[in-house]
A protein has these predicted regions:
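ATP/Mg2+ or Mg2+-diphosphate-binding catalytic cores
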Residues: 262-283
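Hydrophobic packing residues in well-ordered alpha-helices of helical domains and bundles
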Residues: 52, 97-100, 162, 166, ...
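Active-site Asp-x-Gly
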Residues: 129, 134-141, 150, 183-185, ...
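An alpha-helical support segment within catalytic cores of ATP-dependent transferases
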Residues: 1-10, 112-185, 198, 238, ...
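ATP-binding pocket architecture of kinase catalytic cores
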Residues: 19-138, 283
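Conserved PLP-binding active-site segment of the aspartate aminotransferase-like
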Residues: 84, 257-264
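Conserved N-terminal boundary motif of the eukaryotic protein kinase catalytic domain
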Residues: 12-19
């Protein structure tokens, strides 16, 4: 069924038009224009089975538990997700980066008794397991690094020798990582196209990969992909100072996870990043 026909079924009126939007590397994304002038965003398929329902649940969770600006969920089913349209561009002035730091620092003050989440979530197209766990370092080792490493091996994206190196590294993670004072709610996928700004203000955070973990995983991810630069980190540390050693050591440990996610998605040069990181720590 054509998208406009499907939307007519949902709304009881036919939209005036739909336009493809960028950012649909996993599924299709469309801007929908309704007869009354309202604009909506429709997302189609592309994620893991039930993935759009998981995305809807994550956005609703953020809306109900935080002040993070996220699009309202208008309609959700397995193959169709309709969201509020929030204007903005993935271009950030220094003031907008500082505003992003304020938002994320506030998000990271939201805590839970344990690490994980009420359900598994998503990172890109893949399920992200979140069994409730008492201890951060074993959770990060098993549910992030080893889980994704095994997915990469099964997909023939990661040599078996790399997984053995990763397993040996995970046995010694407590040499480099620190447990947080409390599990913090993290967005989990802060790269540039998942954040929108209007002028000097952040207008939306999109496509979360939620769980309660260590806030440093969020900051490491931002540094890896260059989502934000010095104005962001300066303002974040004014609000929530980081213990020594994050930029020197822990950042690279945490970034093994997004590197492995990208190996699973794309292979290629991301495997070199995994190799360099493991070698840096002697594995």
């Amino acid at each position: 069924m054509e998208l406009l026909d499907r939307l007519e079924e949902v709304f009881g009126q036919r939209p005036l038009a739909e336009v493809n939007l960028p950012g649909g590397s996993i599924g299709e994304v469309h801007l929908i224009k309704m007869a009354d002038g309202e604009q909506l965003v429709a997302k189609l398929g592309g994620r893991a089975e039930g993935g759009l329902l998981v995305e809807a649940a994550m956005l609703r969770y953020l809306a109900g538990h935080s002040q993070l600006p996220v699009p309202a969920v208008i309609y959700a089913e397995d193959t169709l997700l309709i969201l509020e349209f929030l204007p903005g561009r993935s271009e950030f002035s220094p003031a907008a980066e500082a505003d992003a730091a304020r938002h994320l620092a506030a998000l990271h003050t939201i805590t839970a008794p344990r690490f994980g989440f009420d359900s598994d979530t998503l990172i890109g197209a893949f399920s992200q397991p979140n069994p409730w766990s008492e201890d951060w370092i074993p959770f990060f080792a098993e549910q992030r690094l080893l889980y994704m490493g095994r997915l990469c091996l099964e997909a023939e994206r990661l040599p078996a020798s790399y997984l053995r190196r990763l397993e040996a590294f995970c046995d010694q993670l407590d040499r480099w990582l620190l447990a947080p004072a409390a599990p913090a709610l993290v967005h989990g996928d802060i790269w540039a196209t998942n954040v929108l700004a209007q002028g000097d203000q952040i207008s939306a955070f999109l496509d979360p990969a939620l769980y309660y973990g260590h806030a440093e995983v969020e900051l490491a991810y931002i540094a890896l992909f260059g989502t934000f630069a010095e104005p962001f980190f300066r303002r974040y540390q004014e609000i929530r100072p980081l213990p020594p050693g994050f930029f020197e050591t822990r950042r690279d440990v945490y970034n093994l996870y997004p590197l492995l996610v990208h190996v699973r998605h794309f292979g290629g040069s991301y495997l070199n990043g995994v190799d360099r990181t493991l070698a840096r720590f002697g594995f």
